Amino acid sequence: MSQPFLPYGRQHVTEADMAAVRRVLEGDYLTTGPEVPAFEADFAAAVAAPHAVACNSATAALHLALDALGVSGGDVCIAPSITFLATANAARYCGADVGFADVDPETGLMTPDTLKAALKRA
């Protein structure tokens, strides 16, 4: 890759973020309080969607999305060969088989051509 490595673990946390976390931790609820539906409503509005569902992790969100799409046994999902394990696991949780597509060495992403090749192998 010609670009510097993406600082995957680096976080950008503001004072407003810290105050929001303190407010939740000092409140009566951690996971079922008013912050969750407020976040879902704000997120839905930000992406112009009628609804949004907060998940505890991207793994859970991928699993939920594939399940909502009806992915199940007999289906094949293609993931890039460079990815976090949850990408493939979410498809397996739904019963689908998983294939992997090579990635472009410059971008680190699968391309239409590598996707086509992976689909032929599937």
Predicted regions and their residues:
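PLP-dependent aminotransferase-like
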Residues: 67-122
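Conserved PLP-binding active-site segment in aminotransferase class I/II-type PLP enzymes
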Residues: 1-68, 72, 94, 116
